[in-house]
């Protein structure tokens, strides 16, 4: 089957709806929607839930942008894209809970296609999901990775280990020499063996996010927390901000190419703190996190 951008777009719109409805049902609060247009072509729907019963902030963004030519910054490393019209679309989301015992979660699925008359289209899928705990619970990590492995299994035995490693490698803060969290799945430039296969995998990842995350939310939402746990959560959120602004390719590309800033920065936590050379107390649950987020085989 030829690449079908319209079909992908319809799935992404439904996925945004489904995830928002599911998160609202769990939380009790509703998303507000901000529809926007891109002057150069395209637009999107940014949805945010703030100060809910469980989630301090959850952002679920759909975007679809298109144009007659790629920016020079994009074609410098991909000369085959020069002179082609393009479409880029995706759903991206980040959930920051109130309760420090519930991890922050992130997911993204996307599709890109560039075309010109008389030539085959250039296209690929990308995406994944990853988990950032503040307090480590092994059963949560095992569930998260088992869900990831199970959705990958129909697509080949090597898919989960390959995309788990890619996720571990990608979500790494080089300036801190530490992982952002416990990873999950990350893939990009996926265009083999064919469109149908790749699209099916992207759908499995998108649909798998809530299956991976919500059981963890349910398991941790009633845990009692106080000022100590909250301060540690805000401190660790600083690492999230550092990664997104220093290392994340999507954030940097969006800001450098005139993307919609409010939507790009929707992933930022609403509150965060830094403290010079802060060190957790030896033997404390906070100190245990650095060991917990080390790369390992969880299943």
From Swiss-Prot:
Homodimer. Keywords: Cytoplasm, Heme biosynthesis, Metal-binding, Oxidoreductase, Porphyrin biosynthesis. Substrate binds at residues 92, 108-110, 258-260. GO terms for cellular component: cytoplasm. One of its GO terms (molecular function) is protein homodimerization activity. It comes from Salmonella typhi. Its EC number is 1.3.3.3. The record marks 175 as: Important for dimerization. One of its GO terms (biological process) is protoporphyrinogen IX biosynthetic process. Belongs to the aerobic coproporphyrinogen-III oxidase family. Residues 240-275 are annotated as: Important for dimerization. The active site is at residue 106. Pfam families: Coprogen_oxidas (PF01218). It catalyses: coproporphyrinogen III + O2 + 2 H(+) = protoporphyrinogen IX + 2 CO2 + 2 H2O. A divalent metal cation binds at residues 96, 106, 145, 175. NCBIfam families: PRK05330.1. Its cofactor is a divalent metal cation. InterPro entries: Coprogen_oxidase_aer, Coprogen_oxidase_aer_sf, Coprogen_oxidase_CS. Involved in the heme biosynthesis. Catalyzes the aerobic oxidative decarboxylation of propionate groups of rings A and B of coproporphyrinogen-III to yield the vinyl groups in protoporphyrinogen-IX. This is Oxygen-dependent coproporphyrinogen-III oxidase.
